């Protein structure tokens, strides 16, 4: 989408908060442990390149992304440290990854064999991480025989450099550790089958790092924590206590573009789902579901000036309306999402309101909303 630079609606990102979150995690790492900063999905909506540069300054060993295009974006921005693509990349694109010094995830033996054909044609060597499905049910090796065969295939194979082996926890953010421990044991078992020697063995994500201890992992893939958000933040449940201080970095702000008084019997929005019962002051905000502010936020309270005001009527594609207790001027600041966790319109409150997680709220705020960076 085209960024709306001529519209008063922006996502603000405090790079100072990002920096402090990374520093806090770096101090929390075990001796000899390193950090990979996860900046997939445009840095969880915060801006991949800008976040990566801060992480690089603070000593991150490298980066994780979800798709090859995200890795190439970082390379174009002169990010030179290792980059791992966590998702499955089609084998035909393995040479592109190799040329750009990007590491790819190996999900199974078939992928290895297919990728080798493309790499051999161009006499290239690709850095790879062996993905293990220890219980996430997503991608990676989960059968002993296939994993053993993959190890044998890789022995003395010059088209691949085995940089890592990893898995992903499904429930490290839960206070019930039963399945978490099951995954640990599964990963430990698969590790015992290795005949090749990866440079890095890694299984820690943000939740595993800040809620658990004693996991032998060369790297921590620090994702949601970079952005100051607690990974245990599920709707209608209390957060687990983080071992490090987390400071939210993102806020979402706009302004009133129109203010009017409507009268008894007047409706607001498509379907007139709000009907005035008396004279009512309505303000219009130039943000809608096309920006990622979905229709389910009808009724949510945003801060207009110094007042918390309910969104009334259905949220439109490009605008929404609020009911105000007093007349305010066009241009009055509207804080849709606050980066202060004590405010009632913080990102967890926004996520809870629509029965989702704050990861999704941040990621949905799309490119039509310019990002404004500051350090405080």
Swiss-Prot record:
Show the HAMAP family listed in the entry: Ala_racemase
Is Cell inner membrane tagged as a keyword? no
Q: Which GO biological process categories is it annotated with?
A: D-alanine biosynthetic process; peptidoglycan biosynthetic process
Give, as in the UniProt entry, the pathway in which the protein acts.
Amino-acid biosynthesis; D-alanine biosynthesis; D-alanine from L-alanine: step 1/1
What reaction is this protein's catalytic activity?
Answer: L-alanine = D-alanine
Write the protein's name: Alanine racemase
Which Gene Ontology terms of cellular component type are present? Answer: cytosol
Q: What does the similarity note say?
A: Belongs to the alanine racemase family.
Question: List-wise, which residues carry N6-(pyridoxal phosphate)lysine?
Answer: 40
EC number assigned by the record: 5.1.1.1
> What is annotated as the active site?
40, 270
Q: Which Pfam families match?
A: Ala_racemase_C, Ala_racemase_N
GO MF, one term, reads: alanine racemase activity
NCBIfam families per record: alr
Q: What does this protein do?
A: Catalyzes the interconversion of L-alanine and D-alanine. May also act on other amino acids.
Q: Which Gene3D superfamilies match?
A: Alanine racemase, Lyase, Ornithine Decarboxylase, Chain A, domain 1
Which residues does the annotation say bind substrate?
A: 138, 317
């Amino acid at each position: 989408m085209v960024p709306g630079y001529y519209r008063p609606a922006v996502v603000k990102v405090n790079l100072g908060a990002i920096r402090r979150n990374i520093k806090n995690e770096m101090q929390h790492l075990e001796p000899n442990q390193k950090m990979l900063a996860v900046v997939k999905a445009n840095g969880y909506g915060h801006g991949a390149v800008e976040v990566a540069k801060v992480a690089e300054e603070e000593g991150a060993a490298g980066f994780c992304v979800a798709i090859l295009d995200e890795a190439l974006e970082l390379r174009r921005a002169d990010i030179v440290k290792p980059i791992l693509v966590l998702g499955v990349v089609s084998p035909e694109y393995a040479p592109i990854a190799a040329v750009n010094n990007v590491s790819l995830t190996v999900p199974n033996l078939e992928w290895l064999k297919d990728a080798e054909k493309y790499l051999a044609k161009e006499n290239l060597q690709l850095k790879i991480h062996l993905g293990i499905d220890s219980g996430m049910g997503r991608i990676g090796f989960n059968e002993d025989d296939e994993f053993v065969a993959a190890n044998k295939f890789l022995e003395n194979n010059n088209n691949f450099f085995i940089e890592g082996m990893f898995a992903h926890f499904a429930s490290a953010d839960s206070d019930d550790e039963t399945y978490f421990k099951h995954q640990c044991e599964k990963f430990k078992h698969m590790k015992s089958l290795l005949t090749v020697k990866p440079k890095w063995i890694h299984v820690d994500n943000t939740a595993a790092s800040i809620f658990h201890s004693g996991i032998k992992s060369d790297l921590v893939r620090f994702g949601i924590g970079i952005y100051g958000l607690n990974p245990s933040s599920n709707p209608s449940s209390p957060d687990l206590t983080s071992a490090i201080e987390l400071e939210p970095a993102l806020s979402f702000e706009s302004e009133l573009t129109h203010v009017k008084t409507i009268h008894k019997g007047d409706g607001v929005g498509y379907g007139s789902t709000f009907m005035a019962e008396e004279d009512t002051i309505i303000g219009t905000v130039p943000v809608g579901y096309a920006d990622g502010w979905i229709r389910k936020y009808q009724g949510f309270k945003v801060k207009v000036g110094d007042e918390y005001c309910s969104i009334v009527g259905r949220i439109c594609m490009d605008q929404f309306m609020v009911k105000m207790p007093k007349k305010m001027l066009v241009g009055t600041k509207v804080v849709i999402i606050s980066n202060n966790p004590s405010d009632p319109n913080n990102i967890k409150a926004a996520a809870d309101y629509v029965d989702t997680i704050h990861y999704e709220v941040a990621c949905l705020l799309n490119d039509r909303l310019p990002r404004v960076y500051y350090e405080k």
